[in-house]
Amino acid sequence: MTTTIKSLKSYKTPLRYPGGKSRACKKMEPYIPDLRDYEVYYEPFLGGGSVALHITKKYPKLKIVVNDLYEPLYNFWLQLQVNGDYVHSELQQLKSKFSDHSSARELFEDSKLKLYDIDVTGKDRAVYFYIINKCSFSGLTESSSFSPQASDANFSMRGIDKLPVYSKLIEDWYITLSLIHI
Protein backbone atom coordinates (compact mmCIF):
# COMPACT_ATOMS: atom_id res chain seq x y z
CA MET A 1 0.00 0.00 0.00
CA THR A 2 1.49 3.34 -0.99
CA THR A 3 -0.57 5.27 1.54
CA THR A 4 1.35 5.50 4.82
CA ILE A 5 -0.16 4.73 8.21
CA LYS A 6 0.31 8.38 9.24
CA SER A 7 -1.64 9.58 6.21
CA LEU A 8 -4.48 7.18 7.06
CA LYS A 9 -5.69 9.31 10.00
CA SER A 10 -8.47 10.80 7.87
CA TYR A 11 -9.69 7.30 6.96
CA LYS A 12 -12.07 6.66 9.85
CA THR A 13 -15.01 4.98 8.09
CA PRO A 14 -16.50 5.11 4.60
CA LEU A 15 -20.03 5.09 6.08
CA ARG A 16 -22.28 7.28 8.19
CA TYR A 17 -23.50 5.07 10.97
CA PRO A 18 -25.81 5.83 13.91
CA GLY A 19 -23.91 5.28 17.13
CA GLY A 20 -20.67 5.12 15.19
CA LYS A 21 -17.34 5.41 16.95
CA SER A 22 -15.32 7.40 14.39
CA ARG A 23 -14.98 10.39 16.70
CA ALA A 24 -14.73 8.26 19.86
CA CYS A 25 -11.73 6.12 18.84
CA LYS A 26 -9.25 8.76 19.98
CA LYS A 27 -10.94 9.01 23.40
CA MET A 28 -11.23 5.22 23.67
CA GLU A 29 -7.55 4.69 22.82
CA PRO A 30 -6.32 4.62 26.46
CA TYR A 31 -8.82 1.83 27.20
CA ILE A 32 -7.87 -0.38 24.25
CA PRO A 33 -5.25 -2.90 25.37
CA ASP A 34 -1.91 -3.27 23.61
CA LEU A 35 -2.71 -5.88 20.97
CA ARG A 36 0.84 -6.57 19.78
CA ASP A 37 0.89 -9.94 21.55
CA TYR A 38 -2.54 -10.98 20.29
CA GLU A 39 -3.16 -13.08 17.21
CA VAL A 40 -6.76 -12.10 16.43
CA TYR A 41 -9.06 -9.13 17.04
CA TYR A 42 -12.80 -9.90 16.97
CA GLU A 43 -15.35 -7.17 16.21
CA PRO A 44 -18.82 -8.69 16.84
CA PHE A 45 -20.84 -5.61 15.80
CA LEU A 46 -19.07 -4.09 12.78
CA GLY A 47 -21.48 -1.28 11.92
CA GLY A 48 -19.54 1.60 10.39
CA GLY A 49 -16.28 -0.19 11.11
CA SER A 50 -14.51 2.67 12.90
CA VAL A 51 -13.02 0.56 15.69
CA ALA A 52 -11.93 -2.28 13.40
CA LEU A 53 -10.36 0.23 10.99
CA HIS A 54 -8.59 1.94 13.90
CA ILE A 55 -7.21 -1.42 15.10
CA THR A 56 -6.21 -2.36 11.52
CA LYS A 57 -4.22 0.87 11.12
CA LYS A 58 -2.55 0.55 14.51
CA TYR A 59 -1.79 -3.19 14.25
CA PRO A 60 -1.47 -3.95 10.51
CA LYS A 61 -0.25 -7.53 11.09
CA LEU A 62 -3.12 -8.48 13.44
CA LYS A 63 -5.77 -10.84 12.02
CA ILE A 64 -9.11 -9.00 12.04
CA VAL A 65 -12.43 -10.87 12.22
CA VAL A 66 -15.52 -8.67 11.85
CA ASN A 67 -19.20 -9.56 12.02
CA ASP A 68 -22.60 -7.99 11.64
CA LEU A 69 -26.12 -9.40 11.42
CA TYR A 70 -27.45 -6.70 9.09
CA GLU A 71 -27.08 -8.30 5.67
CA PRO A 72 -26.92 -5.13 3.52
CA LEU A 73 -24.14 -3.79 5.76
CA TYR A 74 -22.28 -7.11 5.73
CA ASN A 75 -22.63 -7.21 1.95
CA PHE A 76 -21.28 -3.66 1.60
CA TRP A 77 -18.11 -4.49 3.54
CA LEU A 78 -17.64 -7.80 1.73
CA GLN A 79 -18.09 -6.23 -1.70
CA LEU A 80 -15.79 -3.34 -0.80
CA GLN A 81 -13.20 -5.97 0.08
CA VAL A 82 -13.56 -8.25 -2.97
CA ASN A 83 -15.01 -5.91 -5.62
CA GLY A 84 -13.77 -2.53 -4.42
CA ASP A 85 -12.72 -1.34 -7.89
CA TYR A 86 -16.19 -2.06 -9.25
CA VAL A 87 -17.97 -0.37 -6.33
CA HIS A 88 -15.70 2.68 -6.68
CA SER A 89 -16.14 2.92 -10.46
CA GLU A 90 -19.94 2.52 -10.35
CA LEU A 91 -20.29 5.15 -7.64
CA GLN A 92 -18.13 7.60 -9.61
CA GLN A 93 -20.33 7.13 -12.67
CA LEU A 94 -23.57 7.43 -10.71
CA LYS A 95 -22.43 10.54 -8.82
CA SER A 96 -21.49 12.20 -12.13
CA LYS A 97 -24.80 11.24 -13.73
CA PHE A 98 -27.04 12.11 -10.74
CA SER A 99 -25.39 15.27 -9.44
CA ASP A 100 -28.36 17.61 -8.83
CA HIS A 101 -30.88 17.22 -5.97
CA SER A 102 -33.75 16.05 -8.14
CA SER A 103 -31.81 13.29 -9.87
CA ALA A 104 -29.98 12.35 -6.63
CA ARG A 105 -33.38 11.85 -4.94
CA GLU A 106 -34.43 9.64 -7.86
CA LEU A 107 -31.20 7.60 -7.46
CA PHE A 108 -31.80 7.32 -3.70
CA GLU A 109 -35.38 6.06 -4.16
CA ASP A 110 -34.30 3.62 -6.86
CA SER A 111 -31.49 2.35 -4.62
CA LYS A 112 -33.95 1.69 -1.78
CA LEU A 113 -36.08 -0.41 -4.14
CA LYS A 114 -33.11 -2.45 -5.37
CA LEU A 115 -31.36 -3.03 -2.03
CA TYR A 116 -33.21 -6.30 -1.38
CA ASP A 117 -33.91 -7.29 -5.00
CA ILE A 118 -32.76 -10.91 -5.40
CA ASP A 119 -32.00 -10.30 -9.09
CA VAL A 120 -29.44 -7.61 -8.26
CA THR A 121 -25.83 -8.70 -7.78
CA GLY A 122 -24.10 -8.32 -4.42
CA LYS A 123 -21.71 -5.74 -5.80
CA ASP A 124 -24.57 -3.61 -7.15
CA ARG A 125 -26.44 -3.94 -3.85
CA ALA A 126 -23.28 -2.62 -2.13
CA VAL A 127 -23.38 0.40 -4.43
CA TYR A 128 -27.06 0.99 -3.57
CA PHE A 129 -26.36 0.60 0.15
CA TYR A 130 -23.62 3.25 -0.04
CA ILE A 131 -25.92 5.66 -1.89
CA ILE A 132 -28.72 5.20 0.66
CA ASN A 133 -26.28 5.57 3.56
CA LYS A 134 -24.76 8.77 2.19
CA CYS A 135 -27.96 10.44 0.97
CA SER A 136 -30.22 9.83 3.97
CA PHE A 137 -30.87 12.10 6.93
CA SER A 138 -29.11 10.01 9.54
CA GLY A 139 -27.18 7.35 7.69
CA LEU A 140 -29.96 4.87 8.37
CA THR A 141 -30.90 2.85 5.36
CA GLU A 142 -34.47 1.76 4.70
CA SER A 143 -36.04 3.76 7.54
CA SER A 144 -34.66 7.13 6.52
CA SER A 145 -35.63 9.57 3.84
CA PHE A 146 -33.64 11.53 1.28
CA SER A 147 -31.73 14.59 2.48
CA PRO A 148 -30.51 17.12 -0.10
CA GLN A 149 -27.93 18.37 2.41
CA ALA A 150 -26.62 14.86 3.12
CA SER A 151 -26.55 14.16 -0.60
CA ASP A 152 -24.35 17.22 -1.17
CA ALA A 153 -22.11 16.79 1.87
CA ASN A 154 -21.79 13.01 2.12
CA PHE A 155 -22.38 11.54 -1.33
CA SER A 156 -19.30 13.20 -2.74
CA MET A 157 -16.51 12.34 -5.18
CA ARG A 158 -14.05 12.98 -2.36
CA GLY A 159 -15.63 10.23 -0.24
CA ILE A 160 -16.06 7.91 -3.22
CA ASP A 161 -12.42 8.36 -4.17
CA LYS A 162 -11.33 7.19 -0.70
CA LEU A 163 -13.00 3.80 -1.19
CA PRO A 164 -9.97 2.12 -2.85
CA VAL A 165 -7.90 2.89 0.25
CA TYR A 166 -10.57 1.35 2.49
CA SER A 167 -10.66 -1.65 0.16
CA LYS A 168 -6.91 -2.08 0.62
CA LEU A 169 -7.15 -1.59 4.40
CA ILE A 170 -9.72 -4.37 4.77
CA GLU A 171 -8.26 -6.79 2.20
CA ASP A 172 -7.24 -9.29 4.90
CA TRP A 173 -10.31 -8.99 7.12
CA TYR A 174 -12.42 -12.08 7.69
CA ILE A 175 -15.99 -10.75 7.31
CA THR A 176 -18.92 -12.77 8.67
CA LEU A 177 -22.70 -12.56 8.82
CA SER A 178 -23.74 -14.62 11.81
CA LEU A 179 -24.77 -14.79 15.42
CA ILE A 180 -21.73 -14.79 17.67
CA HIS A 181 -21.86 -17.48 20.34
CA ILE A 182 -19.57 -16.93 23.28
What do these predicted regions represent?
Residues 2-27, 31-35, 80-180:
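SAM-dependent nucleic-acid methyltransferase catalytic core
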Residues 39-106:
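SAM cofactor-binding core of SAM-dependent methyltransferases
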